[in-house]
């Protein structure tokens, strides 16, 4: 079906009634890590949970880059109204030219990286568009669209807020799966709460999988290698090889049974 709010879509979607349609749903953070783009790349359609509850000092507004002393935070200052349930799509940027500090930190730490000049000008152009009164979500989505393009991630992306689907947690996820005709749902590995709601998905005819991703190691500024920085780190260091490197960390998705067993093992070892 045609869905409103399409941000990007160069991959052909399944058209037959019997074909499997795999989707993923996740909040669009600031300058996400490699695993976020791997999740997008594995599915037929990706729903950006832009109206989820905003959490202060979360990945919604910050991420990390590699510096000579380790991983360094870059945080977008926002107007936090403090009310329970403030949706991400309503959060506004607070400070003018906050991006100057971000760009300076990036330039200091990546200025000598092999592919710095290939990506920095476009990054700068995007960041400079946003200031007080602008929405954090618009900044995040602009960066995600650009980064996805550089990584050759072609999955169509849709803002969940445009779907008109209400509900909470798993119930809303199931409703969105049904709306777009999904047969399979690929979840971030961290969303283990879904293990308690598998029956809801099964009743809707949706099979649940969990992402299996091991951060790939590559030549990085300021050894030793540190994983889980923004995907900018990969692009600045490896350039056109970045997409292939990103996908090299992908494993066969976990089943709920495998995730439950792994979680039980972790709890037993504590």
Model-derived segments and their meaning:
Residues 3-270:
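Residues lining hydrophobic/aromatic ligand-binding pockets adjacent to catalytic sites
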